[in-house]
């Protein structure tokens, strides 16, 4: 498998000379297995450049097929979809894979971005074939030669980590998550107050989910001095990512 980062920033895209090395686009990753299964993880502004590259391949001929894994639907993770060129080419096929939520679907959320007050092209007018598949948290799925595991993260709303296994390798993608001992966030996670027993169970579970993966991709929105008094904002530090990678025995860490 090959994993490419097209966007690594959070909250909003940036364009500054001191950020050129890692780029300024918001979250988007692309994974392709040796067998040709293609997975897009989130549609921040980085998905725009990914789309341009895809149009140079079979997607430009209307022959492309990809899965789109939805980590969560905060705006910095979906704002690029209206500008994703392969959506506008008839014959292309995409399946949004997302956790089921009560009262709202991923189609509702994406269509909202295309409301004529925000964007001139209605979502239903996109030329590509777009399907949807919902899963329950903890469910494991198989798409082509890729096996996907799912885990709920500690972030406002419903946020999902994915474990992708293919070609004898594995990677875990944790985009947005917070220190569980400092706050409890997200649908069904309970109140915001820390709880030692819950934190211990969560830590054990997320470690097991990541255990033995060749690569862990993990949120590191803050550095240590920045996170003080901001633990409730749903993000971690590079040190937090390193500690999880050490507990889980991951071979490589990207943050």
Spans of features found by a protein language model:
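Binuclear metal-dependent hydrolase catalytic cores
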Residues: 1-186
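Metal-dependent phosphodiesterase/nuclease catalytic metal-binding core
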Residues: 28-33, 133-255
């Amino acid at each position: 498998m090959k994993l490419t980062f097209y966007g690594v920033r959070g909250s909003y895209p940036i364009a500054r000379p001191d950020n050129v090395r890692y780029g300024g686009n918001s979250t988007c990753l692309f994974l392709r297995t040796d067998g040709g299964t293609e997975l897009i993880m989130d549609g921040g502004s980085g998905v725009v450049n990914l789309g341009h590259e895809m149009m140079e391949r079979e997607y430009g001929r209307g022959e492309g097929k990809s899965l789109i894994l939805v980590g969560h639907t905060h705006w910095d993770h979906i704002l690029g979809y209206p500008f994703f060129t392969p959506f506008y080419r008839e014959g292309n096929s995409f399946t949004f894979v997302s956790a089921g939520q009560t009262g709202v679907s991923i189609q509702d959320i994406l269509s909202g971005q295309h409301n004529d007050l925000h964007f001139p092209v209605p979502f239903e007018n996109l030329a590509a074939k777009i399907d949807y598949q919902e899963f329950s948290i903890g469910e494991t799925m198989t798409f082509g030669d890729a096996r996907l595991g799912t885990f709920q993260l500690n972030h406002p709303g419903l946020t999902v980590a994915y474990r992708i296994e293919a070609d004898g390798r594995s990677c875990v993608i944790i985009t947005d998550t917070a220190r569980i001992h400092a706050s409890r966030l997200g649908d069904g996670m309970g109140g915001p107050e820390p709880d030692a027993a819950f934190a211990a169970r969560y830590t054990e579970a997320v470690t097991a989910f990541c255990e033995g993966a060749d690569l862990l991709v993990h949120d590191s929105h803050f550095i240590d001095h920045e996170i003080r008094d901001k633990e409730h904002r749903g993000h971690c530090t590079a040190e937090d990512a390193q500690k999880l990678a050490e507990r889980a025995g991951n071979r490589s860490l990207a943050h």
